[in-house]
């Protein structure tokens, strides 16, 4: 099932809800959870390259850098992550950090789903 959730601030979040799974696996792919875990467990801002390299070390197979970049940017738009912009050799780049802790993210997603279920 795919739901388009419109948050309080008008931001839309596309979530695929897999009721056969539990926890974050209901909403996110393994590489996305690994990306979030990295950002939840560091105080540093990480570049997409850093996240991509670490995720590919953690998971079997190869995740494309584009998949990581797209997920990180979507997570910024959806209010899960924050970033600062720096300049470098090739122009501007984003360094990402978690906006919400893991428990806050759980609460945030739970509240959105609960709110939408009450409209049935």
Language-model features, listed with the residues they occupy:
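A short, conserved structural fragment
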Residues: 76-87
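Short, cationic-aromatic polyanion-contact patches
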Residues: 86-107
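Short helix-coil junctions and helix-kink-helix linkers
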Residues: 53-65
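Amphipathic alpha-helical dimerization/coiled-coil segments
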Residues: 103-120
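Short alpha-helical segments that sit at the start of domains
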Residues: 3-37, 42, 101
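Basic amphipathic alpha-helical segments that dock to polyanions
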Residues: 68-78
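Short acidic, hydrophobic short linear motifs in intrinsically disordered regions
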Residues: 45-55
